[in-house]
Every structure is written in structure tokens, then in C-alpha cells.
Amino acid sequence: MIIRSAYLEGTVAAADRPAFDAHMRGPVMAAIATYPGLRDVRLRELARGEEGAPAVYMVFDLYFDSLADMDAALASATRQAVRATIQMGMRAFQGRVYHLVFSESASTAAP
């Protein structure tokens, strides 16, 4: 399993958070869900940061079966539509966005 994580590192002014969060949870999640080959998309919002941790506001995790599937999705016409939807809400965000790609190598359920 391949996981492409988009980190939004920064802040959103308190007055803008409800609209920003609603845009990310609604239109952005719906747009991302249209990527070809996507198995799952999850949105993680910071519950608490530890001392010294970067100020990550939220993370989108996109799950694909393979790097080839991820690359095909990112090369598709869908990507431009997703980017446009994301950009509509980004005026409220102060910071940077970066991506990391992980391969899931182990998993176990807690007893």
C-alpha cells in the first residue's frame, strides 16, 4: 500500500477556521475522492502537538495500491480539478504544503 500524505504546516486565523475546515472536509475531500485508482482518502486534524513538533494544521492521506497507480492519478486530468478546488480555500492558510510518500510495510491490530 502506498500512502501519499499532504501536510499543511502553518496556521489558519481563528475567525477563518470554520470555513476553511468545512471547505477541506467537504469540497476538497470530494474532489480528491475522484482520483483514478484511489483506494481511500483520510483527513487528519491536529488534536495536540508535542513540544518542538512542527505546526502541522492537518494532513490528507491518499491510499493507492502501488506507486504506478499513484503516479497515474497525479498525471491525470483530475489533478488540475483537485488543485483548483484546494486553491479556493487556501487564502485563509498561512504556511506551506508539502508531500511525503510512504509504503506501508507492517500493520497489526491492538489486542
Residue ranges with predicted function:
Residues 45-47, 101-104:
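A general secondary-structure junction signal
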Residues 33-39, 53-55, 63-100, 111:
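An amphipathic, aromatic/His-enriched active-site/gating alpha helix that lines ligand/cofactor pockets
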Residues 24, 32-33:
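Hydrophobic C-terminal alpha-helix "anchor/cap" residues
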Residues 1-10:
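Active-site-flanking beta-strand signature of metal-NTP-handling nucleotidyl enzymes
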Residues 21-25, 75:
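Amphipathic, non-transmembrane alpha-helical scaffold segments
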Residues 14-20, 68-72:
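Short, conserved charged micro-motifs
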Residues 47-59:
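Charged, often glycine-rich, active-site loop that binds/positions anionic groups
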